[in-house]
C-alpha cells in the first residue's frame, strides 16, 4: 500500500473518532500543540534552516525563501495563533435551522465536520500548523502534502503536533503528512475520492489550476491573487499613494497584494508621475503601457502576459484606462476573482465598480491587503476562496463544516 493510501486510511479512521470529540477536548489538544511549538522551537528552527540552505542552493527567489523561513518570532506567532483558535466559537453542533411540523416531527439542521480534509500547498511551513489546527478545531482529520522545499520543516512541525496529540484525548492519526513530495503523490490525492472528503490547494496559480483541473475529489478553491487597484479620475492623490504603496509593498509575496494598477488617463497625467516615482523608489519594478513608460522612464514596456500575471514579488503592471467601465472590463478579463479596489470620490462610480466586479472582496478607498480572516473579524482562515459554491472569501471555521439534518419523532409514518 502506498504512503498516500496508508495515511489517508489512518486519517479516515481518526475522523470517525474526531466527530465524537467535545469542544473542551479539542481545545485541550490545541493548547498542547501551542505548548509543543514553543517548547520544541529549537528543533523546528534547526530543521527549517536545512530547508532554507537547500532552497538557496537551488536558487529559490528571495520571496520564496521569505515564505519558507521560520524564525523565533514567526514560530511564536504561530503558537499564539493556535491559542487564539481556542477562544473562537466551535461551529460543530451549531443549530442553523429548526422546523416543528404539525405532525410532531422536529427537523433541525446542524453543522458537522467535513471528515478528512486534504491540503496540498507550497513552501509555507505556517500552513502546516494552520491547516492542522483549524481542522482539529472543527472535528476533522487532515492529510497534509507540502512541497519538497519545506519538507524538513513540515516533518518537524507534524512530529511536534503528533506528540502533542498524544498528550490529549484526540487521536494521533488525525494529522497526517505525506513525506513523499513527488508528483505521483499529488496525483494520488487528486483522485482519492474514497479517502478524502475535500481537497484544498494553497499556493500559486499554477498549483491551484492543476488541482482544479485534475482533481476528482471536491475542491475548495483558494484562488490566485491577480488583484487590482483602479484609481478613478476623482481619487484623492495622497490617499491613492498611500493605498497603492501599501497594497503592493507591505508584503508583495501574499495573495491579497495587488499585481496590477489601473489609472484613469486624466489622473495619470496630473498625478501619475509622482506615484510611479514613489513606487520605483520603493523597489517596485513597473511594467506599463506607453503612457506609463513616458511618465516613468524606469518602467518597462508591459507584455500581454503581464496583465494576467500573479508575480508574488515587487513587480507591478500598470495601465491607463479611459473610465471606470474600461477598468471593470480589464479586471473581468484578467482578474482572478480575489480582491479588487476602486479609489474614488465619486459615489456612483464606486457603486458601479462594487456591483459590476466579480470578486470575493471588492473595496472602495481601502487596500486589498485587508482580505484576511483575522482582519475581517472571522478569526483564523484555511484560505481565501474565489469560487462561489460552499464558501467565498476568507474561509473561517464554518467553511470546514458541512450540515446534517436531525429528525426527531415519536412513531410518525408518511401517508
From Swiss-Prot:
UniProt organism field: Bacillus velezensis (strain DSM 23117 / BGSC 10A6 / LMG 26770 / FZB42) (Bacillus amyloliquefaciens subsp. plantarum)
UniProt GO MF annotations: glutamate-5-semialdehyde dehydrogenase activity; NADP binding
Catalytic activity: L-glutamate 5-semialdehyde + phosphate + NADP(+) = L-glutamyl 5-phosphate + NADPH + H(+)
GO BP annotations, alphabetical order: L-proline biosynthetic process
Pathway the protein acts in: Amino-acid biosynthesis; L-proline biosynthesis; L-glutamate 5-semialdehyde from L-glutamate: step 2/2
Official protein name in the record: Gamma-glutamyl phosphate reductase
Function text: Catalyzes the NADPH-dependent reduction of L-glutamate 5-phosphate into L-glutamate 5-semialdehyde and phosphate. The product spontaneously undergoes cyclization to form 1-pyrroline-5-carboxylate.
Top EC category: oxidoreductase
PROSITE patterns (alphabetical): PROA (PS01223)
Gene Ontology CC terms: cytoplasm
Known EC number: 1.2.1.41
Domain of life (superkingdom): Bacteria
